[in-house]
Amino acid sequence: MKQCEGMVFSDNLAAAYVAAVVELFNKEHPDRYLGRTALQKLLYFARAMGAPLPFSFEIYTYGPYSDGLSFVVEGMLADETLEDTSQDQARYSNYRITEQGRYLLEKYGEHLNPHKGVLREVVRIFGGFEPSTLELIATLHFLVQRLKRQGSGRPQEEEVVRRFLEIKGEKFPRGAVSSWYKALEQSGLIE
């Protein structure tokens, strides 16, 4: 196994999970952009679906957000295991894996391989959505999970939609929020 020189921040399992999701996304959706918001949401759903990611998420401007994940991504960019190919990096990102990033996949393969199916499924299901749709879906899912932890059992749809609209205001129409709630319920992501 070839070792890459100069990897200061990203020679760890957390970065390997990020690299795996970026690589899977680039293969599944080669013509789509993978920016900060979408990457956060894909890894949020990977964790929600059982991948043992070391990131914790809290609600933020664009839905569930992890400071730890942002730190890992910044470290990967600094170590050049990940690159941002966007033409206007101040406004948006477009992440791609590098050769050094592929080294992480090889080095941490035994840890990643048991979870590649979940990662692949997350990228397949959610990778085609626009970041704003991912924001809506992930925020709904996050709220259901939070309300479940705070109360007894699964919260009612109306309570989740009400909380969602308190957080997001008028950014999303109530009908769209309700429709996505039902879609998450039917898919089994809300139990």
What residue spans do the PLM features occupy?
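Domain-edge interaction signal
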Residues: 1-191
